[in-house]
Amino acid sequence: MGKSAATRPSAAAAPEAPAPVETAATETASTEYEPLLPRIPILDLSPQVDEGHWAASAFSGEVVPFRATAFREGHDRIGVDLLLLNPSGTQTEHHMRAIAPGTDRWEVEVQLEQEGLWRYRVQAYADEYATWRHNAEVKVPAAIDVELMLTIAHDLLAKAASDKRRSTAERRHLSEAARVVADAERGDDERFQAAVDDRIKRILTERPVVALPSLSATRAVLVERTRAGVGSWYEFFPRSEGAKRLPDGAWQSGTFRTAAKRLPEVAAMGFDVVYLPPIHPIGRTFRKGPNNTLEAGENDPGSPWAIGGPDGGHDAIHPDLGTEKDFVFFLGKAKQAGLEIALDLALQASPDHPWVTQHQEWFTTLPDGTIAYAENPPKKYQDIYPINFDNDYDGLRTEVLRIVRYWMSLGVRIFRVDNPHTKPLHFWEWLIHTVNETDPDVVFLAEAFTRPALLHTLAKAGFQQSYTYFTWRNTKEELEEFLTGLAEDTPDFLWPNLFVNTPDILTEYLQFGGPAAFKIRAAIAATGAPTWGVYSGFELYENVARPGAEEYIDNEKYEYRPRDYARAAALGRSLAPYLTMLNRARSEHPALRQLRNLHVHGSEDDAVLVYSKFLAGEFTRSGKPDAVLVIANVDPHSVRETMVHLDVTAFGIEPGAQFEVRDLVTGQRWTWGADNYVRLDAFTEPVHILTVKPLEAAR
């Protein structure tokens, strides 16, 4: 089910047009006004997206904080519960606790496991026992209204004891307390203590004496499979894996079968998903040559994004890569290695695509009769025709759905969508909803480097993952704001995929930062979000750009790029062991696989970034809390010495307590407190990735 379907209003709830103004002005003249607020106001529910227009998002295993603002007039105490309905129709109740004193904000964290649509409401109520206890603990010791307070206590205890939902033992304890409170032969203090006994307080906290129950509106949370929100991605071009230059200078393309040999190495680095650029036939007309030149040689392979030729279009496989059988073989080898394959879905066409002659209405025809090619000024893509959705929308969307389902039938369950922000958003909402209605495990990643409103709406419309501007967030201040925003501002609908590089993006930070820059970016991406990714060559420190551009020289989009990973490793020039360490840390530390739990800490250096991730023991398989603290020198050209100042309560340590940290990068251990000295040398190890344990647990 798509996100939008969860809370889309029915036709009856959303008439086609508002009533005329004069009708609206007179229709309630003799009707009593019905307040919008319940008896006890409940406001600002979270998670919710656009007041419930869309279902909020969560992935299986995610710990979701449910929050609401609830209060009542006067000083009487209230209680607040989360009423949570799972996809199977079973409702559970969860007591919410007051947070941030003075804000009337309530919260409870719940780990959502079952995939499907969850619904929740918040119930607020007058907590009669808590109100009585608050008043009695002031009045009784001061000998004010003692008998009245005890009479009220007896009535409350008797009422609670009559609640058949309580256990027999609880009802017995409550009845006995009521009997003691009512016994005027006993002293006032004994009677009072019977009503505030720790056991009675526990019983009436776990199941309060409720009055004036009030309910919020219903909101929905769509829980998707874990891989939709958590994973380590690795991108490679299958044509480069196994490609060879022949004696005559021509190239022999790699195939799915040669590329399959690379999969165990990718899996050994700890990656979960291998993303392939388009695997379809490539057009010849206006084919781009090396480095995006306008003239291609006879043996230049062209850009995989210039889709379509005599051998077919989006439902065809480039003959150099193999056949459908070879692709299925490749998928099988990936599965054996514990990998999923993500396929590129790029809705555009080369001038040679069958669509150009069969469905010219799917493109934009200019006044001179030519078809408009793609442009992103100052870039021009003469080898690519963009799609026009407005001439034959129904025909085009039917064809795209057919294509997606074809690749699904072969075993593809993840699609990386190229430039979705250049296509109509209602189309994506329809496509993703239609696919997920029958195949909820299919995941769509939006490769959309665009304005926040567009990016956010794509996510709300159904995209499970989104590219972000992470690649251009490099300073401490930029990264603090960026990572905090991901964890706090948008997690209800946007799950980021933090790629450190792409075939299109080689930032100046990587171009000129040396090996330290590669470590820094990988460490922050791998620990800052549940999903991250690298494009092949990153582990070889590839950093040479085409002059004047943030793109690689000899870009793999336009030529074959076989790489000698084994030789680089033998020479000690490979980052693969570091990437392996990062993915192992993610595997071993569930806190790193959560999105909403990132907390930024302070340092006295404007280049030292500090953040932690924490997961309480109730949410881990081991039953033990998990805490990881990351301290990064984001200046790849320097040695930084500074003090870091930690809010230790953010990762489960009592204020003032010492704790042990162990560096997953070097294996070193230290005993720390809230304020600590650090030295980070960009020329050796620029990042600490520290596990945190109380001293008694570390021994």
Per-region residue spans from a language model:
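Active-site neighborhood of glycoside hydrolase catalytic domains
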Residues: 365, 388-455
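Catalytic-core region of carbohydrate-active enzymes that cleave or remodel glycosidic bonds
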Residues: 434-447, 452, 474-548, 617-620
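Short, acidic/polar
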Residues: 254-265, 392-407, 517-522
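Hydrophobic faces of well-ordered beta-strands that scaffold small-molecule active sites
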Residues: 232-234, 274-276, 341-343, 415, ...
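Short, solvent-exposed turn/loop segments enriched in Gly/Ser/Thr/Pro and often Arg
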Residues: 275-284, 345-354, 418-424, 447-451, ...
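Substrate-binding cleft/loops of secretory-pathway carbohydrate-active enzymes
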Residues: 350-361, 428, 436-437, 449-477, ...
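Carbohydrate-interacting/catalytic domains
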Residues: 1-243, 247-272, 281, 334, ...
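Aromatic- and acidic-residue-enriched carbohydrate-binding clefts of CAZyme catalytic domains
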Residues: 229-254, 282-330, 357-394, 553-562
